Amino acid sequence: MAFFIADDCIGCTICAKKCPVHCISGNVQELHVIEPELCIDCGVCGSYCPVNCIYDGDGMQTFKVDPKDRPIAEVNVGNCTGCIACVEICPFECIEMKTENIDGRFFEVADVVHKKVCVGCRLCEMVCSDKEAIVVRWPDGAAAPDFRNPGYYL
């Protein structure tokens, strides 16, 4: 079920700017709306909302997360096939391909080059052919749980 925005929205627009699938609309200083058919339930909008007015599909409130505490994508070079699916899907162009020397052989692999821009939306994980190649992790290195599960918040 899609996330939704409560009436106490201040219209700051940050949720719309950070949404990886552009499913949030609204004017400055007016209530914003999430298009449920487009929402991927990633929770990124709620993790940026300064007034905590975004709720998941079960009606659970989401809360703002400090930028230094947000999970971001990391590539396990040894598992990356170089398929470029993650590069193509990343809405914020955080991932690029680079040449990596693995055991004396050169391969094109993904690299998260703009870590501060990554919102942890997990689109890269969803399209990765090898689920171990790219993982969204907390700053301490622990794998972040899937926030599309009910009751999980960034």
Residues covered by each model-derived region:
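Iron-sulfur (Fe-S) cluster-binding modules
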Residues: 1-4, 131, 135-154
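Hydrophobic face of beta-strands forming the core of extended beta-sheets/solenoids
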Residues: 5, 34-35, 75-76, 86, ...
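Tandem repeat domain/solenoid detector
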Residues: 36, 52, 71, 77-78
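Short pre-active-site segment immediately N-terminal to redox-active cysteine/selenocysteine motifs
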Residues: 8, 18, 37-38, 48, ...
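Iron-sulfur cluster-binding cysteine motifs and their immediate structural context
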Residues: 14-29, 44-61, 85-103, 123-141
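Short linker/helix segments within small regulatory modules
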Residues: 28-34, 69, 102-117
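Intrinsically disordered, low-complexity Ser/Thr-rich linker and spacer segments
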Residues: 56-73, 144-145
